[in-house]
Amino acid sequence: MSALEKSMHLGRLPSRPPLPGSGGSQSGAKMRMGPGRKRDFSPVPWSQYFESMEDVEVENETGKDTFRVYKSGSEGPVLLLLHGGGHSALSWAVFTAAIISRVQCRIVALDLRGHGETKVRNSEDLSAETMAKDVGNVVEAMYGDLPPPIMLIGHSMGGAIAVHTASSNLVPSLLGLCMIDVVEGTAMDALNSMQNFLRGRPKTFKSLENAIEWSVKSGQIRNLESARVSMVGQVKQCEGITSPEGSKSIVEGIIEEEEEDEEGSESVNKRKKEDDMETKKDHPYTWRIELAKTEKYWDGWFRGLSNLFLSCPIPKLLLLAGVDRLDKDLTIGQMQGKFQMQVLPQCGHAVHEDAPDKVAEAVATFLIRHRFAEPIGGFQ
C-alpha cells in the first residue's frame, strides 16, 4: 500500500481526534504511524510541488486583472489545469509532482477569478463565458501569438470551464481535453442540494491546521498530503466579522441600544469593534469565496455540457469517481468511442487530490497514446 493510499484510507476515518501511535483507529501494522505520533495537519508550501509562481496581468476594456499561476516543467505540451469551485490551483499540487515524473510536459495551474490569489475587479462574475475568456486571455498573455500545444484539464466547475473554453476556440493551440468528475446530468441533479451542503460547512476555522483537519475528516479531501497544500488556497485570514451568527447578534445589539439611547452610539461602536476582534482572534480563518452567492451561475456552467464536450473535435478524456455518474448523452458517446473514459473507484469528488498517482497515470497514458508527450523513466 502506497503512502498516498494510506492517506486516502485515513481520510475516511470518522471525525474524532487522532489517536497517538495509530494515525486513527484502523488496526494493522501497515496503518501505524509510529509510537506517540499524531497525524500532521500543518500546511505545506506550494514550492514543494511547483517550480515557480507567476502573477499574469491581463488587460481588457476596464483595466488590468491579475491571475495567479503555478508552474513546473520546461519541455513538452502545456497542461493547463483548472480547479473546481471553491478550490484553487494548489489542488493540483500533488498531481503535478506525479505527472511531471511520468511524461515530459509543462504545468500551468491557474487560480480562476474569485478564487485563490487571483485579483480581478469583478470577482463576482463567475459566468462560464467570462471564465472561459479569462483562460484564453491568460494563455495569450503568457505566450502571445504562438502558444505551445496545450491540453486543458479541469475538475468539476473547472472541467465545465475547460469545455466552454475549448468549444469557443479560445485556445488556438488546443490538442486535448480532460474533464474530471463532472457530468451534466449528475451535476444538474446535485445543484438542488448544493446550498444545504454549503450551509453544513464550518463558517470559520481556528487555524490553518484546523481547516486541514476538517477537510480530511469530513471527506472533502481524502488524501492528507494533498489537503496540507490545497486547503491553504481555500481559506484566508478574516478581514471583518467572521461569523454570520456573531454579526447578527452584534447588529441586533446595536439596534436595541440605539432605540434606548441614540447618544450612546460611541460606546456601542466600541463594543462592536471589541466583539469583532474577539471573533477574529478565536476563528481567524474563513473561506476565500462564498460559493452560496455564485448560485445564479451554476446552471450556466453545466447545462448542455455533455453535448459541448462531445462536439469538441479533439481527443478527449473523462475521469470519473464512479460509472453511475454517466448521463445519457455521455453513455451514448462513450459507446460510440467519442472519448476515452476511466473510472477511479474509492475516490471522493476531488479525484485528482484523492488519487493523484492514478490520475497522473491516466493522463500520462492518454498523452503518450496520442503522441502528445514523451514518457520519462520507462513509463509506458
Curated annotation (Swiss-Prot):
It catalyses: [phosphatase 2A protein]-C-terminal L-leucine methyl ester + H2O = [phosphatase 2A protein]-C-terminal L-leucine + methanol + H(+). Residues 268-280 have a biased composition (Basic and acidic residues). Its EC number is 3.1.1.89. Phosphorylated by SIK1 following increases in intracellular sodium, leading to dissociation from the protein phosphatase 2A (PP2A) complex and subsequent dephosphorylation of sodium/potassium-transporting ATPase ATP1A1. Residues 1-38, 255-280 are annotated as: Disordered. PROSITE patterns: LIPASE_SER. InterPro entries: AB_hydrolase_1, AB_hydrolase_fold, Epox_hydrolase-like, PPase_methylesterase_euk. Keywords: Hydrolase, Methylation, Phosphoprotein, Serine esterase. Binds PPP2CA and PPP2CB. Demethylates proteins that have been reversibly carboxymethylated. Demethylates PPP2CB (in vitro) and PPP2CA. Binding to PPP2CA displaces the manganese ion and inactivates the enzyme. This is Protein phosphatase methylesterase 1. It comes from Bos taurus (Bovine). The lineage of its organism: Eukaryota, Metazoa, Chordata, Craniata, Vertebrata.
